[in-house]
Amino acid sequence: GIKVNHMIDEPTAGALHYAYESNGALKGYYAVYDLGGGTFDISIVKIDGFDVEVIATDGIAELGGDDFDTALQKIIQKKYLKQTGEEMEEGDFTKTMAEEQKKSLSKRDIKPKVLKETIEISRSEFEDEISSMIAKAEMTCENVIELSKIKLGDIEAVFLVGGSTRIPLVQQSVKRVFKMTPTATTNVDE
């Protein structure tokens, strides 16, 4: 059988990944911002070489990429109805299609083809739709900073974990809260 010595959460796993990627050179306090498909977690950790200690952690169980996909589906459904006068039927624009379009929106405005219609969606429209979700994540970050009792200026870096951290609005939000550009050098979730 398998012997499990310790269970760790995703932000801690992300911190360990960055610690090992740096060959043990990291020392100090770090934030790990984990926004994946289904959940959001933020942790303040202390890293000393290969040792990672969680100082504070918080999260939102119902916030992730799936919610952003749903938001994009809503935009597409509204625009389709406006252009055609018809409701989209179940399965006309699937969650998988929304996820692919979301990834494209992280790079540029998009024009997905829905049935026979081309629907233009700008990144700013998408960002407007998800901004309230990002605001909740910001409040959670501020809460975990307060819980950690670590001064914002003592945090060395913010590590991004999870596919949804590729969304430019997410990165801007992290920069605004932590007053630094986040580190997104690797995709530890892949």
Functional labels for PLM-detected ranges:
Residues 1-190:
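Oxyanion-binding/catalytic loops of NTP- or PPi-dependent enzymes
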